Amino acid sequence: MSSTAVATAREQAAFAAVELARHPDRPRALHVVAQAFDDWTELRGDRFYGDDRAVIGGPARLGDTTVMVIGQEKGNDPMTRALHNFGMPHPEGYRKAQRLMRQAEKFGMPIVCLVDTPAAYAGVGAEERGQAWAIAASLLCMLAVRTPTVSVILSEGGSGGALALALADRVLALENAVYTVAPPETCAAILYRDAAQRARAAAALRPGVDTAHELGLVDELIPEPYPGAHAHAEFVIAALRGALIRHINELRELPLDALLAQRRERYRGAGG
């Protein structure tokens, strides 16, 4: 199949779902922080190299509970997108996330992760500063942290860059989000040697979170009224807030050792 071939209806539909998840007006992590949480205090830096604005985080109030919020921020316009590196974290972003997870554990705060990235940043500098190790350490930290964790796929959950903040006790997703092993363009370039075959790759990836929900990788889908969260942000964020409060309250009732055992079994059995 050449790059000029017409995509099938199935392929077109699959990539249309990706394009909807990438809509520039969808609610971002900072919108959710502002509308779903109270008294958020941002903490910056990884205490090793610097601060990565693609990852934001700090303690906040969610209902009656103090939580640690960690999010991947994309921005909505050219200025904020550049500021936040289009939501693609560097190693220092993941190290900042690990630092905040350890603080949450120390002070007994549940963790809420807001996932929204096409992938971790793949630049030379990021690789030289240990991108693979930073992602691996975040995966380990999420699996081992001794406090309840909830992750939310807001729009794009791409590759290990998303998974590094998504190995939670509960995983929620906005209805029109995507959650996939790689962006369709990257997958097409690898498998077909042609990034233009992104629609074909999208169909193979089955990126919609409904698929992840069917597989048990996502626990709850947050409904988005037509045409999507970009047109109904306040409604969707209010629904997300209610779901977060409910899941965190449920998780806090479990003995910590039982919670950690469930988390380990959940991810050991993933895909089985």
Q: Regions from the language model: what does each represent?
A:
Residues 1-67, 71-74, 86, 230, ...:
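Intrinsically disordered, low-complexity segments enriched in small/flexible residues
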Residues 24-31, 55, 92-95, 130, ...:
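Charged, alpha-helix-enriched surfaces in structured cytosolic catalytic cores
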Residues 27-49, 73-88, 111, 143-158, ...:
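Charged, low-complexity, helix/coiled-coil-prone segments
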Residues 35-39, 51, 57, 63-114, ...:
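Glycine-rich beta-alpha loop segments
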Residues 45, 58, 64, 71, ...:
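Glycine-centered flexibility sites
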Residues 115-245, 249, 253:
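Conserved catalytic cores of soluble enzyme domains
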